[in-house]
Amino acid sequence: MSNVNLSVSDVWRLMMRVCWLVRQDSRHQRIRLPHLEAVVIGRGPETKITDKKCSRQQVQLKAECNKGYVKVKQVGVNPTSIDSVVIGKDQEVKLQPGQVLHMVNELYPYIVEFEEEAKNPGLETHRKRKRSGDSDSIERDAAHEAEPGTGLEPGSNHNQCSVPPKKGKDAPIKKESLGHWSQGLKISMQDPKMQVYKDEQVVVIKDKYPKARYHWLVLPWTAISSLKAVTREHLELLKHMHTVGEKVIVDFAGSSKLRFRLGYHAIPSMSHVHLHVISQDFDSPCLKNKKHWNSFNTEYFLESQAVIEMVQEAGRVTVRDGMPELLKLPLRCHECQQLLPSIPQLKEHLRKHWTQ
């Protein structure tokens, strides 16, 4: 058998980028979007959507594989949105990795993924998904949660929050784990370097982009996609997650006089249930905008105990309508309720409370 020697440039010439539309709750297989071909989807067997408010021809999608985005045109009458911003009938908007497309009425969330694939079937198929965990992509996310990764030790240089994860021998990532950054928790929770505590039910990791001096995530080993998937069967697990969160505060911030809150985002950006354990100083350069602030300081942040009581009484978690609108509220100090015009001014104001 003859040997074929390919240079790096030869390999890239043999590669082609492909685009996939992926349902975030994994209700159906991902849908391939061929380069520059108009694909119309909506209610039907392909999407498993039966909601009659969703047209059979709700959106037209056209992938610009070379440019790394998808043009989305709303065809149906009812609203299609990207990151909670309605597109509008017969209007066209770009959908980029890191953004969430809701098919209709803020329901049925989708993301796009790009992969590199070998053109020559004789070569071993090589796929490399376009990672969208950079800061720009995270800024676009509706909840603006950080992608957990290598994390920061309390007291370390918070400016690291703008530095991408290191690659190399020290940071192996399984091929099958690569994908949209919203799947990042599933990778991070398996990384011993990130774990600060674990037992048979849960693992605690440091948030890679902490929004305060102390910011951890408590995750169950059991795969639970979101709060909507929580049932009464998960009640003891939720209680255990809360107990572990309190334990981590004592173990790692016991000498601190900081106040903490434990809770969940109403609409999480990461596809695995996770409990935030966050100090209330919000002293972090990773806290960059209004959505970051409001995701922790409005009713968008669901208290852990309230979630437990909800499941105990109703057997499920109910998230009321209009949650994305809370992220647009004016900036208000969580300590004294004073309104502030900008994040820099809010941060300067918060310093006054640290000394009290």
From Swiss-Prot:
The modification Phosphoserine is found at residues 132, 137. It holds the Pfam family FHA_2. Residues 1-110 are annotated as: Interactions with ADPRT/PARP1 and NCL. One of its GO terms (molecular function) is DNA 5'-adenosine monophosphate hydrolase activity. One of its GO terms (cellular component) is nucleolus. Residues 122-173 are annotated as: Disordered. The active site is at 274 (tele-amp-histidine intermediate). One of its GO terms (biological process) is single strand break repair. A motif (Histidine triad motif) lies at residues 272-276. A zinc finger (C2H2-type) spans 331-353. Residues 132-147 have a biased composition (Basic and acidic residues). Residues 182-287 form the HIT domain. Its EC number is 3.6.1.71, 3.6.1.72. Interacts with single-strand break repair proteins XRCC1, XRCC4, ADPRT/PARP1 and p53/TP53. Interacts with NCL. Interacts (via FHA-like domain) with MDC1 (phosphorylated). The histidine triad, also called HIT motif, forms part of the binding loop for the alpha-phosphate of purine mononucleotide. This is Aprataxin. It comes from Macaca fascicularis. The gene is APTX.
